[in-house]
Amino acid sequence: MLIKVKTLTGKEIEIDIEPTDKVERIKERVEEKEGIPPQQQRLIYSGKQMNDEKTAADYKILGGSVLHLVLALRGGGGLGQ
C-alpha cells in the first residue's frame, strides 16, 4: 500500500509498504529516498511518535495515510551515549 511521509519542509515522499512492515522498515525506506539515517528520524502518526518495533498495522495505517517526519536532535543522553 502507498503511504506518504511529509517532511518539515512540506515535501511529501511516497513509500510502498506492507501492513506487516515495522516502523524500522519504513524508516529504512525513507533513508533510501532521502538519505536520512533511521536513527535521526522520528515518525509521527496521529500525533504520536511511532515505535520502531511496532508495525504499520499496529498503528492502523492505511493506504493514503500521511506520516510526519521530524529529525531527532543530537545529544541529550540518548541510548548511544
Curated annotation (Swiss-Prot):
Interacts with AHR; interaction is direct. Interacts with NUB1; interaction is direct. Interacts with ESR1. Cleavage of precursor form by UCHL3 or SENP8 is necessary for function. Residues 77-81 form a propeptide. The modification N6-acetyllysine is found at residue 48. Keywords: Acetylation, Isopeptide bond, Nucleus, Ubl conjugation pathway. One of its GO terms (biological process) is protein neddylation. PANTHER family: UBIQUITIN (PTHR10666). GO terms for molecular function: protein tag activity; ubiquitin protein ligase binding. This is Ubiquitin-like protein NEDD8. The keyword Acetylation applies. One of its GO terms (cellular component) is glutamatergic synapse. Ubiquitin-like protein which plays an important role in cell cycle control and embryogenesis via its conjugation to a limited number of cellular proteins, such as cullins or p53/TP53. Attachment of NEDD8 to cullins is critical for the recruitment of E2 to the cullin-RING-based E3 ubiquitin-protein ligase complex, thus facilitating polyubiquitination and proteasomal degradation of cyclins and other regulatory proteins. Attachment of NEDD8 to p53/TP53 inhibits p53/TP53 transcriptional activity. The gene is Nedd8. Pfam families: ubiquitin.
